């Protein structure tokens, strides 16, 4: 199976302009731009046939080419990473599976992506897959504190009995009544922003209008659900280090600490 990992990256992030080029120090104190760290995370994945940085910005493209990454240039009309992957796919050779490893997902363990590839290899009917982690009650309380402080703390997902996503939200779902967090494990599953798509699912996504739910939540994957394209939720184990994305400038210190904890140079 020909698996292409695509790393969509844009310079004009609404929350953090220039984010892909932000320098982050690793375990040894060496600073590398975010896009390079995301690329290095991608090349550690077993089973990938190719890795490409996908962007519409020459500053990002030049930086990526400088550390040896293959680059696919896309138009500035792409509204999100999934649309960017769909456009980039048109410039690639025959591909059986596309993995969208978002440009700020530098701490994503290779095993998460490998689990998606394995799931899609075995479930031939699956069109889209994405990982999620079941959270401990203490981790949910930390997310509640982030939310109360007005910061984006993460996206949560609920799924049906067959493991297909019912909904994703930037709010904590499901509702947690009194006592829901009394045990060690919670009913909350944190979504990890990595996706595996069949090419036909990407084409269908690009041809589908933006949905109201997608706009309200600011979550691109909801377009699949609104269009009736199921998303398989693959449960993965929470890593030993904090799994953070660079969403806000305030996240830099925590991400550098996580890089050090993971032993990533």
Language-model segments: which ranges?
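N-terminal glycine-rich phosphate-binding loop and ensuing alpha1 helix
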Residues: 2-54
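Short, high-confidence coil segments that cap the C-terminus of an alpha-helix
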Residues: 48, 94-95, 123-128
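Conserved core of the sugar-phosphate nucleotidyltransferase
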Residues: 108-211
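Short, acidic/turn-prone active-site loops that include or flank metal/cofactor-
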Residues: 11, 75-81, 238-240
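Conserved alpha/beta core of the MobA/IspD/sugar-nucleotide pyrophosphorylase nucleotidyltransferase superfamily
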Residues: 168, 182-265
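Hydrophobic/aromatic residues located in beta-strands of well-ordered beta-sheets
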Residues: 5, 51-53, 98, 129, ...
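Short phosphate-binding loop-to-helix
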Residues: 52, 58-118
């Amino acid at each position: 199976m020909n698996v292409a990992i695509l790393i969509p990256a844009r310079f004009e992030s609404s929350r953090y302009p220039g984010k892909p080029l932000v320098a982050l120090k690793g375990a040894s104190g060496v600073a590398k731009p975010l896009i390079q760290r995301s690329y290095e995370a991608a090349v550690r994945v077993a089973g990938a046939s190719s890795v490409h940085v996908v962007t519409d910005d020459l500053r990002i493209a030049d930086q990526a080419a400088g550390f040896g990454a293959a680059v696919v240039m896309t138009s500035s009309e792409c509204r999100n990473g999934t649309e960017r992957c769909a456009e980039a796919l048109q410039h690639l050779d025959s591909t059986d599976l596309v993995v969208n490893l978002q440009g700020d997902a530098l701490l994503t363990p290779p095993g998460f992506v490998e689990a998606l590839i394995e799931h899609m290899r075995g479930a031939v009917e699956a069109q889209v897959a994405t990982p999620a982690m079941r959270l401990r009650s203490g981790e949910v309380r930390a997310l509640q504190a982030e939310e109360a402080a007005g910061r984006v703390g993460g996206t949560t997902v609920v799924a049906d009995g067959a493991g297909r996503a019912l909904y994703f939200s930037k709010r904590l779902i499901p509702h947690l009544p009194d006592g829901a967090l009394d045990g060690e494990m919670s009913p909350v599953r944190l979504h990890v922003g990595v996706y595996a798509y069949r090419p036909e699912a990407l084409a269908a996504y690009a041809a589908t209008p933006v949905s109201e739910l997608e706009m309200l939540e600011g979550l691109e994957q909801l377009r699949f659900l609104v269009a009736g394209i199921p998303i398989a939720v693959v449960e993965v184990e929470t890593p030993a280090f904090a799994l953070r994305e660079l969403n806000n400038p305030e996240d830099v210190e925590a991400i550098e600490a996580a890089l050090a904890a993971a032993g990533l140079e």
